[in-house]
Protein backbone atom coordinates (compact mmCIF):
# COMPACT_ATOMS: atom_id res chain seq x y z
CA UNK A 1 0.00 0.00 0.00
CA UNK A 2 2.76 2.46 0.91
CA UNK A 3 4.66 1.62 -2.30
CA UNK A 4 1.61 2.53 -4.34
CA UNK A 5 1.29 5.79 -2.37
CA UNK A 6 4.87 6.57 -3.41
CA UNK A 7 3.93 5.92 -7.04
CA UNK A 8 5.92 2.71 -7.25
CA UNK A 9 4.77 -0.41 -9.01
CA UNK A 10 3.75 -3.46 -7.02
CA UNK A 11 4.66 -6.50 -9.07
CA UNK A 12 2.29 -9.22 -10.15
CA UNK A 13 4.45 -11.59 -8.10
CA UNK A 14 3.56 -9.67 -4.93
CA UNK A 15 -0.12 -9.49 -5.88
CA UNK A 16 -0.26 -13.21 -6.59
CA UNK A 17 1.57 -14.08 -3.36
CA UNK A 18 -1.04 -12.18 -1.35
CA UNK A 19 -3.90 -13.69 -3.35
CA UNK A 20 -2.57 -17.21 -2.81
CA UNK A 21 -2.03 -16.52 0.90
CA UNK A 22 -5.62 -15.42 1.30
CA UNK A 23 -6.92 -18.34 -0.76
CA UNK A 24 -4.84 -20.78 1.31
CA UNK A 25 -6.70 -19.67 4.44
CA UNK A 26 -10.27 -20.07 3.19
CA UNK A 27 -12.40 -22.50 5.18
CA UNK A 28 -11.78 -26.19 4.48
CA UNK A 29 -9.11 -25.55 1.85
CA UNK A 30 -5.99 -26.47 3.76
CA UNK A 31 -5.22 -28.52 6.85
CA UNK A 32 -1.43 -28.69 6.63
CA UNK A 33 0.31 -26.42 9.16
CA UNK A 34 3.62 -26.68 7.30
CA UNK A 35 2.09 -24.91 4.30
CA UNK A 36 1.05 -21.98 6.49
CA UNK A 37 4.56 -21.63 7.93
CA UNK A 38 6.00 -21.75 4.41
CA UNK A 39 3.51 -19.08 3.26
CA UNK A 40 4.39 -16.81 6.21
CA UNK A 41 8.12 -17.24 5.58
CA UNK A 42 7.74 -16.48 1.85
CA UNK A 43 5.66 -13.43 2.71
CA UNK A 44 8.15 -12.13 5.26
CA UNK A 45 10.95 -12.53 2.70
CA UNK A 46 8.91 -10.64 0.09
CA UNK A 47 8.02 -7.97 2.66
CA UNK A 48 11.71 -7.38 3.41
CA UNK A 49 12.31 -6.78 -0.31
CA UNK A 50 9.37 -4.36 -0.47
CA UNK A 51 10.48 -2.44 2.62
CA UNK A 52 13.89 -1.94 1.01
CA UNK A 53 12.18 -0.17 -1.92
CA UNK A 54 10.33 2.33 0.28
CA UNK A 55 11.59 5.89 0.45
CA UNK A 56 9.46 6.82 3.48
CA UNK A 57 9.53 4.26 6.27
CA UNK A 58 8.06 6.62 8.87
CA UNK A 59 4.82 5.67 10.63
CA UNK A 60 4.68 2.15 9.24
CA UNK A 61 2.43 -0.19 11.17
CA UNK A 62 3.82 -2.78 13.54
CA UNK A 63 2.53 -5.43 11.11
CA UNK A 64 4.58 -3.90 8.29
CA UNK A 65 7.75 -4.01 10.38
CA UNK A 66 7.34 -7.33 12.22
CA UNK A 67 9.49 -10.23 11.15
CA UNK A 68 10.29 -13.72 12.36
CA UNK A 69 12.71 -16.41 11.38
CA UNK A 70 11.42 -19.39 13.35
CA UNK A 71 8.19 -21.29 13.70
CA UNK A 72 8.30 -20.57 17.44
CA UNK A 73 8.39 -16.80 16.85
CA UNK A 74 5.40 -17.09 14.54
CA UNK A 75 3.47 -19.16 17.06
CA UNK A 76 4.27 -16.70 19.86
CA UNK A 77 2.92 -13.83 17.75
CA UNK A 78 -0.30 -15.56 16.69
CA UNK A 79 -2.38 -15.00 19.85
CA UNK A 80 -1.33 -11.35 19.94
CA UNK A 81 -2.66 -10.63 16.45
CA UNK A 82 -5.36 -13.27 15.99
CA UNK A 83 -9.07 -12.61 15.69
CA UNK A 84 -9.65 -12.49 19.44
CA UNK A 85 -6.97 -9.82 19.91
CA UNK A 86 -9.67 -7.28 18.98
CA UNK A 87 -11.67 -6.91 22.19
CA UNK A 88 -14.64 -4.92 20.87
CA UNK A 89 -16.98 -7.56 19.45
CA UNK A 90 -18.62 -5.21 16.95
CA UNK A 91 -15.30 -4.05 15.54
CA UNK A 92 -13.99 -7.63 15.54
CA UNK A 93 -17.06 -8.90 13.68
CA UNK A 94 -16.90 -6.17 11.05
CA UNK A 95 -13.19 -6.73 10.50
CA UNK A 96 -13.76 -10.45 10.06
CA UNK A 97 -16.66 -9.85 7.69
CA UNK A 98 -14.35 -7.71 5.57
CA UNK A 99 -11.55 -10.27 5.73
CA UNK A 100 -13.89 -13.09 4.68
CA UNK A 101 -15.09 -10.92 1.81
CA UNK A 102 -11.49 -10.42 0.73
CA UNK A 103 -10.81 -14.14 1.04
CA UNK A 104 -13.74 -14.80 -1.28
CA UNK A 105 -12.39 -12.17 -3.65
CA UNK A 106 -9.01 -13.93 -3.54
CA UNK A 107 -10.66 -17.13 -4.75
CA UNK A 108 -12.06 -15.32 -7.79
CA UNK A 109 -8.69 -13.68 -8.41
CA UNK A 110 -6.69 -16.90 -8.01
CA UNK A 111 -8.84 -18.70 -10.57
CA UNK A 112 -8.78 -15.72 -12.94
CA UNK A 113 -4.99 -15.48 -12.53
CA UNK A 114 -4.67 -19.17 -13.44
CA UNK A 115 -6.29 -18.31 -16.78
CA UNK A 116 -3.98 -15.32 -17.33
CA UNK A 117 -6.38 -12.58 -16.19
CA UNK A 118 -5.62 -9.98 -13.53
CA UNK A 119 -6.86 -6.60 -12.29
CA UNK A 120 -4.51 -4.17 -10.55
CA UNK A 121 -7.40 -2.19 -9.05
CA UNK A 122 -8.78 -5.29 -7.32
CA UNK A 123 -5.31 -6.29 -6.08
CA UNK A 124 -4.69 -2.78 -4.73
CA UNK A 125 -8.11 -2.74 -3.04
CA UNK A 126 -7.54 -6.11 -1.36
CA UNK A 127 -4.17 -5.04 -0.01
CA UNK A 128 -5.27 -1.59 1.15
CA UNK A 129 -8.35 -3.07 2.79
CA UNK A 130 -6.32 -5.69 4.63
CA UNK A 131 -4.19 -2.86 6.01
CA UNK A 132 -7.34 -1.00 7.09
CA UNK A 133 -8.46 -4.01 9.15
CA UNK A 134 -5.43 -3.27 11.36
CA UNK A 135 -6.34 0.40 11.80
CA UNK A 136 -7.64 0.88 15.34
CA UNK A 137 -8.84 4.42 14.54
CA UNK A 138 -11.62 3.15 12.24
CA UNK A 139 -15.08 3.26 13.82
CA UNK A 140 -17.86 0.73 13.36
CA UNK A 141 -19.44 3.11 10.82
CA UNK A 142 -16.15 3.27 8.91
CA UNK A 143 -15.97 -0.52 8.87
CA UNK A 144 -19.59 -0.86 7.72
CA UNK A 145 -18.77 1.43 4.79
CA UNK A 146 -15.66 -0.64 4.06
CA UNK A 147 -17.75 -3.82 4.19
CA UNK A 148 -20.09 -2.41 1.55
CA UNK A 149 -17.16 -1.35 -0.60
CA UNK A 150 -15.67 -4.84 -0.23
CA UNK A 151 -18.92 -6.29 -1.56
CA UNK A 152 -18.84 -3.96 -4.56
CA UNK A 153 -15.26 -4.86 -5.42
CA UNK A 154 -16.14 -8.52 -4.87
CA UNK A 155 -18.66 -8.18 -7.70
CA UNK A 156 -15.84 -6.76 -9.84
CA UNK A 157 -13.81 -9.87 -8.95
CA UNK A 158 -16.69 -12.11 -10.04
CA UNK A 159 -16.90 -10.19 -13.32
CA UNK A 160 -13.18 -10.69 -13.89
CA UNK A 161 -13.52 -14.43 -13.27
CA UNK A 162 -16.50 -14.58 -15.63
CA UNK A 163 -14.43 -12.83 -18.30
CA UNK A 164 -11.56 -15.22 -17.67
CA UNK A 165 -13.80 -18.28 -17.95
CA UNK A 166 -15.77 -17.16 -21.00
CA UNK A 167 -12.67 -15.72 -22.67
CA UNK A 168 -10.87 -19.03 -22.20
CA UNK A 169 -13.64 -21.61 -22.58
CA UNK A 170 -16.38 -19.71 -24.41
CA UNK A 171 -19.91 -19.00 -23.27
CA UNK A 172 -21.94 -21.85 -21.79
CA UNK A 173 -24.68 -23.05 -24.10
CA UNK A 174 -27.45 -25.55 -23.88
CA UNK A 175 -26.23 -28.90 -25.16
CA UNK A 176 -28.26 -32.01 -25.82
CA UNK A 177 -26.79 -35.10 -24.20
CA UNK A 178 -27.84 -38.72 -24.38
CA UNK A 179 -29.16 -39.78 -21.00
CA UNK A 180 -30.05 -43.28 -22.11
CA UNK A 181 -28.66 -46.56 -20.85
CA UNK A 182 -26.34 -48.89 -22.78
CA UNK A 183 -25.04 -52.41 -22.18
CA UNK A 184 -21.42 -51.24 -21.92
CA UNK A 185 -19.65 -50.59 -18.62
CA UNK A 186 -19.52 -46.94 -17.73
CA UNK A 187 -18.94 -44.33 -15.10
CA UNK A 188 -21.82 -42.47 -13.52
CA UNK A 189 -21.13 -38.76 -13.15
CA UNK A 190 -23.58 -36.67 -11.17
CA UNK A 191 -23.63 -33.29 -9.57
Spans of features found by a protein language model:
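Metallocofactor- and cofactor-centric catalytic cores in central/energy metabolism, strongly enriched
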Residues: 1-191
Amino acid sequence: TRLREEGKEVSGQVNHLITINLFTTITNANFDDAIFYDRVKATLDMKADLLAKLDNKENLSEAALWTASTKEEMEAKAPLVGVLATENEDIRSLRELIIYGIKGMSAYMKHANALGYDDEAINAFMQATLAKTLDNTLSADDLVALTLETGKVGVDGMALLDSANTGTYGHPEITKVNIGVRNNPGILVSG
